[in-house]
């Protein structure tokens, strides 16, 4: 029987040693595959028929449960590293208007989906969702309950800025039905915090974590970033010491993507203070070693969880999936996106809302869904999304089962990809057999690179002349190397 999931808790010492040797040669820029096709492949333009068709198909699938993402874009202060869609303001009057328009959007969406569809997973992201005052948070939650049925047994999470909440606000979140919280930390080192314009003492974060534990939240997650200015392996190790003292249920340790040509706030970061590639690699490897030694399960890419956390259990049982929030246990449901720039994944279509308040408000003032762009998935997209998801989440692709579901001959349909995989196999990233493809412990550390092999859009890019100055990632097609040309928003694989 083909295994349904990865069973090893983390890459072993040999894999980490090989990773150090290989990373510099195989590194490059690539997608994170929170969707396929990736968001940069969406078609610009408000094709409302695409969204209407998606909602109609979702309505026909009732009473299947939904996932819901709600975007609150406001922040009081700018963090220089941030690449999120955000609005920096101290005018809390702006959020009151935004809440009213969220209600309008919910009404339009719910009217097409059918009344009070059940929501098993919801997530408030930003920006800073806790920018909203208590009254506004109650109002948004009341609107959600008016138009949807938020299942009490579901997973309902919110991103928190520990600098903006106290015990009373945490108690309010629990009262409103949130059972998971995600806290932005990035790094506890004072010099790093100064360089990224985010001063957040450890004691401030500990108070919020303690409140979450006291109030009975099901899960507490912390977000860290490595590759920030002034970081070293030793300094980041001290941050890990402090994080381990808090013992979060989940940890995300993201690689900082320095893209000042895309994200203007990053232009305030001193590039000379960024850790060199070798030091950044040391930070990552030492972090994986330390967290593994402390009992955390390496979920994949940048996610870690305690063994009894839902993510770790889902991985062991082969139920792990990915969506726009990363690894998830509920990614198989249609996801509705609400608020500016929010992305929905509904009935084989991706839809993204307008990115500015003016466009968002303007559409809703005319009684229209605030769609900005999207794409309808082809049969090939569905097939490749399943392959990429299996490799990134479970580490195993069951070829006979895939062939049966999609009516294909894998070896014929993916001959160029298999040739590329042979090259990655020679580097120890994958093991290929007639009935399966298995990602090795080393390959788990570079799983984005493995997934890129099956990205048809990257192959089409590679077939066109590379843009001037673009850095390409080589892959072997059995004859001449394929050059995967990175796009502007892609971050480094390592």
Curated annotation (Swiss-Prot):
Domain spans labelled Radical SAM core: 60-294
> May I ask which residue range the UniProt record assigns to the signal sequence?
none
- Residue sites binding S-adenosyl-L-methionine 2 per the record: 81, 127-128, 186, 198, 223, 257
**Which cofactors, by name?**
[4Fe-4S] cluster
> Record's PROSITE patterns?
RADICAL_SAM (PS51918)
Q: What happens when the gene is disrupted?
A: Cells lacking this gene accumulate coproporphyrin-III only under anaerobic conditions.
A single GO CC term for this protein reads:
cytoplasm
Q: What else is known?
A: HemN is able to complement a S.typhimurium hemF hemN double mutant under aerobic and anaerobic conditions.
State the function annotated in the UniProt record. Involved in the heme biosynthesis. Catalyzes the anaerobic oxidative decarboxylation of propionate groups of rings A and B of coproporphyrinogen III to yield the vinyl groups in protoporphyrinogen IX.
Protein name as catalogued: Oxygen-independent coproporphyrinogen III oxidase
Q: What species is given as this protein's source?
A: Cupriavidus necator (strain ATCC 17699 / DSM 428 / KCTC 22496 / NCIMB 10442 / H16 / Stanier 337) (Ralstonia eutropha)
What is this protein's gene name?
hemN
């Amino acid at each position: 029987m083909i295994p349904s999931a990865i069973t090893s808790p983390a890459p072993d010492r040999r894999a980490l040693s090989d990773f150090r040797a290989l990373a510099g040669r195989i590194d490059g820029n690539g997608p994170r595959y929170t969707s396929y096709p990736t968001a940069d492949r969406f078609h610009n333009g408000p094709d409302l028929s695409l969204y209407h068709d998606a909602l109609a198909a979702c309505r026909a699938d009732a009473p299947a449960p939904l996932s819901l993402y709600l975007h609150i874009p406001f922040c009081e202060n700018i963090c220089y590293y941030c690449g999120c869609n955000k609005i920096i303001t101290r005018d809390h009057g702006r959020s009151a208007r935004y809440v009213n328009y969220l209600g309008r959007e919910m009404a339009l969406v719910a009217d097409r989906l059918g009344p009070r569809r059940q929501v098993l997973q919801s997530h408030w992201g930003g920006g800073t969702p806790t920018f909203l005052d208590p009254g506004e948070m109650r109002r948004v939650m009341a609107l959600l309950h008016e138009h949807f049925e938020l299942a009490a047994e579901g997973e309902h999470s919110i991103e928190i800025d520990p600098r903006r909440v106290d015990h009373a606000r945490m108690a309010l979140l629990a009262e409103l039905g949130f059972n998971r919280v995600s806290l932005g930390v990035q790094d506890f080192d004072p010099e790093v915090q100064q360089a990224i314009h985010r001063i957040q003492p450890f004691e401030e974060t500990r108070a919020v974590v303690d409140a979450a534990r006291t109030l009975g939240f099901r899960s507490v997650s912390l977000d860290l970033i490595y590759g920030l200015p002034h970081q070293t392996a030793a300094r980041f190790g001290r941050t890990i010491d402090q994080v381990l003292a808090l013992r979060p249920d989940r940890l995300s340790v993201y690689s900082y993507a320095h893209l000042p040509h895309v994200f203007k706030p990053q232009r305030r970061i001193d590039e000379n203070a960024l850790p060199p590639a070798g030091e950044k690699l040391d930070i990552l490897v030492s972090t994986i070693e330390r967290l593994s030694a402390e009992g955390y399960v390496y979920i994949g890419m940048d996610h870690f969880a305690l063994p009894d956390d839902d993510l770790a259990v889902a991985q062991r049982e082969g139920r792990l999936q990915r969506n726009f929030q990363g690894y998830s246990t509920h990614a198989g449901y249609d996801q509705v996106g609400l608020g500016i720039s929010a992305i929905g994944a509904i009935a084989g279509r991706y839809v993204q809302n307008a990115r500015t308040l003016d466009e968002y408000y303007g559409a809703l003032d005319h009684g229209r869904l605030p769609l900005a762009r999207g794409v309808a998935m082809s049969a090939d997209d569905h097939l490749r999304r399943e392959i990429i998801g299996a490799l990134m989440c479970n580490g195993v692709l069951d070829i006979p089962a895939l062939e049966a579901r999609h009516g294909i001959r894998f070896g014929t349909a993916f001959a160029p990809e298999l040739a590329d995989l042979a090259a990655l196999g020679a580097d120890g990233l994958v093991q290929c057999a007639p009935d399966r493809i298995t990602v090795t412990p080393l390959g788990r550390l570079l799983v984005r690179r493995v997934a890129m092999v099956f990205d048809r859009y990257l192959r089409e890019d590679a077939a066109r002349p590379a843009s001037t100055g673009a850095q390409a990632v080589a892959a072997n097609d059995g004859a001449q190397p394929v050059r995967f040309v990175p796009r502007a928003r892609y971050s480094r694989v390592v």
